[in-house]
Amino acid sequence: MASIDFRNKINWHRRYRSPQGVKTEHEILRIFESDRGRIINSPAIRRLQQKTQVFPLERNAAVRTRLTHSMEVQQVGRYIAKEILSRLKEQNRLEEYGLDALTGPFESIVEMACLMHDIGNPPFGHFGEAAINDWFRQRLHPEDAESQPLTHDRCVVSSLRLQEGEENLNDIRRKVRQDICHFEGNAQGIRLVHTLMRMNLTWAQVGGILKYTRPAWWRGPVPDSHRYLMKKPGYYLSEEKYIARLRKELQLAPYSRFPLTWIMEAADDISYCVADLEDAVEKRIFSVEQLYHHLYHAWGHHEKDSLFELVVGNAWEKSRANTLSRSTEDQFFMYLRVNTLNKLVPYAAQRFIDNLPQIFAGTFNQALLEDASGFSRLLELYKNVAVEHVFSHPDVEQLELQGYRVISGLLDIYQPLLSLSLNDFRELVEKERLKRFPIESRLFQKLSTRHRLAYVEVVSKLPTDSAEYPVLEYYYRCRLIQDYISGMTDLYAWDEYRRLMAVEQ
């Protein structure tokens, strides 16, 4: 048996109430079908229909939301997975790699990882992330915990401020401040699936969405060997023990990635590049003709049988030939999407197979579609045109600024809950309303029951007589507020901000 054995990676056990005993191929497939049901029927997936892809608060149903984007990624992920399995079958390597009885789970894990890949994104996308992190940095100043003298620590939270002679506790304070100021959608996705939603998915399915392997509390440089894998936070301090168990169950070395995650990542890269351009045309940011010229000029030197001509040029010519029977827009994007998929999917599949030893070990330190090939150049072309002509458009930038202000404003509104003393907040949690804190009581009542219960569950397990208790209690209180606000849809966040700011509807 080769060292690559996917039976050691496609782990169908669960954290709680795990199936026991030896399972047949059909029984294992049923376990992953259960995962599919849990994911597709979860409220977090439904909320994606009102979260931003590129254009916030969009009323045009033809423009993509996070949900429609995720469904497209799911389809591309399935295509890549099938292509990989088909090629391995042709090479008679399925059995060698322990995949002969696991092709169904292999595909299902990829599909559901694709559907879930944006599940933790806050309202207004990356600008929502930036708003959360900026707001907490302005109060916790994690950089002061690294280099400044203790007397210069600007952290406004007394329990998190560094103290002389408390080095062990100071180390926890540093980790907590760093962690809270590095909210990230992928890390929040892990927290949603395990801690908040308690979906109890199989270890393999959760491994599929652990896209980045750097802890959110990481301080200092990352090793060159894992620079790509650790370029963003992948999980929080609150899920540290769960991720440690996940690594053990999936036989992952520290800071290594689950093999099927590379497929999910490639599917996302392929999907959003074309989709963002199509949505921009739908929004009349530019016409199809203008888009073609943007792409043509951005490609640079042109040759007759270049990848540009085979993909973009071919789509343009075919769409112009059918103008009498179909709209040029629809035709162009249909051909562009098909041409792009037909070139990039086989390439991504072959890259996966060619680099399988490193990918299986979880150490392949780049994306499948990130190399010096023309295929990567094509993806970069789409991305660069989107950056130059879509994301920089005044309408898009104005909406992003509004989104940033909404999230910052909501954090300002809920800030009184973070200003309460430990004892006062504990009493508020127990009694739910306190006459001496009318504003805080009303704000606390507005928090989601699911999020409040998650806070209570974890804090109740902390030893109250420990020196760490005030530090960790405040950490989980910050998580409570971040969980609530990041879980809102764009529209709900917008409406909630206007209601609480007493702005005319």
Curated annotation (Swiss-Prot):
Q: Give a yes or no for keyword Ribonucleoprotein in this entry.
A: no
Q: What does this protein do?
A: dGTPase preferentially hydrolyzes dGTP over the other canonical NTPs.
Matching entries from HAMAP family are given as: dGTPase_type1
Provide the protein name: Deoxyguanosinetriphosphate triphosphohydrolase
Subunit (UniProt): Homotetramer.
Enzyme Commission number(s) of this protein: 3.1.5.1
Tell me which Gene Ontology terms the entry assigns under biological process.
dGTP catabolic process
Q: Does the keyword Signal apply?
A: no
From the UniProt record, list the coiled-coil ranges. Answer: none
Cofactor(s), names only, from the UniProt record: Mg(2+)
| Any Pfam family the entry gives | HD
The record lists the catalysed reaction(s) as: dGTP + H2O = 2'-deoxyguanosine + triphosphate + H(+)
Name the gene. Answer: dgt
**Gene3D superfamilies named in the record:** Hypothetical protein af1432, putative deoxyguanosinetriphosphate triphosphohydrolase like domain
**This protein's UniProt keywords:** Hydrolase, Magnesium
Q: Which NCBIfam families match?
A: dGTP_triPase, PRK04926.1
Which GO molecular function, any one, fits this protein according to its record? dGTPase activity
Domain HD as annotated: residue spans: 66-273
Q: Which organism is it from?
A: Salmonella typhi
Domain of life, per the record? Bacteria
Q: Which family does it belong to?
A: Belongs to the dGTPase family. Type 1 subfamily.
